[in-house]
Amino acid sequence: MAGSVLKIAGRRLSQHTGSGAPVLLRQMFEPKSCTYTYLLGDRESREAVLIDPVLETAQRDAQLVKELGLRLLYAVNTHCHADHITGSGLLRSLLPGCQSVISRLSGAQADWHIEDGDSIQFGRFALETRASPGHTPGCVTFVLNDHSMAFTGDALLIRGCGRTDFQQGCAETLYHSVHEKIFTLPGNCLIYPAHDYHGLTVSTVEEERTLNPRLTLSCEEFVKVMDKLNLPKPQQIDFAVPANMRCGIQTPPS
């Protein structure tokens, strides 16, 4: 199969094959949970992946895939979300041949369970999997194979980060994940998060390394800040998390 999960050990794939076209990227927004969904495709093979689809906008995503003449191989989740129900189960029904993907450490059901170091191939491109736990134990960051862009889920947000006070979160673990798995990428690597609540769409590794008010702190100071956030519980957590544990392979009831 052209879209297979491969192990990459110490080598970097090229984003381009010869003079081939660059990766196709579309960033989409779901306003209720302020979630970004990302569509990436190979303009030559027409193979594509979706990152962090939302149930309420899965029909929109499927329509865009069809309009662009793409073949969706994977609906991928960066982690088991607490603020929305994933659209991956519905997309499997809407676009036959699509498979759901999530980290094995998430404990959620899916067609494919990935681990740190795995690569999701679509045409000439690949998304490298970097385990980035802390927000949840199963969080991963997906890095395009030329290291030009990273899809950080809730681990790293623009000038912020995911909370660590539920779903077995750990502030110290998150701090080390970001510094060791994301901040080690090139400074001009684009950062695309799973959420933004201020109208921002993209950042860079260098910006976040130098300007992120939480992650420029020491680890000890970061843990203290995270412990004092005292945020309200996500409105959808009580039904979103149970649903997301199985919606990788099931279409949610209407």
Swiss-Prot record:
Record PTM N6-succinyllysine, positions in chain: 32
EC numbers for this chain: 1.13.11.18
Known regulation of activity: Glutathione increases enzyme activity.
Broad class of enzyme this protein falls into: oxidoreductase
Catalyzed reactions per annotation: S-sulfanylglutathione + O2 + H2O = sulfite + glutathione + 2 H(+)
Amino-acid positions noted as binding Fe cation in the UniProt annotation, renumbered to this chain: 79, 135, 154
Cofactor(s) the protein requires to work: Fe(2+)
Chief location bin: cytoplasm
Places the protein is found: Cytoplasm; Nucleus; Mitochondrion matrix
Transit peptide, start-end: 1-7
Molecular-function annotations in GO: iron ion binding; sulfur dioxygenase activity
Subunit structure: Homodimer. Monomer. Interacts with TST. May interact with RELA.
Family (UniProt): Belongs to the metallo-beta-lactamase superfamily. Glyoxalase II family.
Function recorded in the entry: Sulfur dioxygenase that plays an essential role in hydrogen sulfide catabolism in the mitochondrial matrix. Hydrogen sulfide (H(2)S) is first oxidized by SQRDL, giving rise to cysteine persulfide residues. ETHE1 consumes molecular oxygen to catalyze the oxidation of the persulfide, once it has been transferred to a thiophilic acceptor, such as glutathione (R-SSH).
Protein name: Persulfide dioxygenase ETHE1, mitochondrial
Gene this protein is translated from: ETHE1
